[in-house]
Amino acid sequence: MEHKLEDIIAIFNQCFEEEYNTRLVKGGDEPIYIPENDEVPYNAIYFARGFYSSALHEIAHWLVAGKERRKLEDFGYWYEPDGRSEERQRDFEKVEVKPQALEWILATAAGFRYFASTDNLNGNPGDTQPFKQAVYEQVKTYAEKGLPKRAETLRHALAQFYGAEDRIDLAKFDVTRI
């Protein structure tokens, strides 16, 4: 199955451009979220380097962000660049569990392979298995309790577009493969 950038952009924008004044945009080397301002009259989620996986990841951060955070550049999150110590890596992973669980759910709805990202290629990521397990546990929680409204809207749209099953089937989530 081919995953075109034009498709994920169109699907996202159809779901959210009108109600949330938010667009998904192919960006450059680094992803960033920029709220509407004097120069750009809409909120923009810029994903990196034309990667479908980056689009899903940045969308997931937008889906987690509440109304007030969506008014801030990059949702007001701290970001420590690649090369983090193992301790700082654990802090980073704590804020990544929910977005990555949503990313995995969206990827599965689109028939796209998800890989957990610790985003620390030049540092010491340590044992990543606890992080992957935490992401899986969050997927289970979402499957049992339901997704937030915006996440469910997009999950449903992706499943319809890609002809996937229109539910979160935990049998399709294998923590050993991420």
Where is each model-derived feature located?
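Short pre-active-site segment immediately N-terminal to the catalytic Zn-binding motif
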Residues: 1-4, 38-54, 89
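Catalytic zinc-binding patch centered on the HExxH motif and its immediate surroundings
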Residues: 14, 19-42, 123-126
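Active-site recognition of the HExxH zinc-binding catalytic motif
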Residues: 53-67
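Post-HEXXH active-site segment of zinc metalloproteases
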Residues: 64-97, 115-125
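An active-site-proximal "capping" alpha-helix that borders the catalytic cofactor pocket
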Residues: 93-108
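Substrate-binding/catalytic groove segments of enzymes
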Residues: 106-118
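A metal-dependent hydrolase signature that marks the N-terminal structural subdomain at the beginning
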Residues: 1-22, 155-174
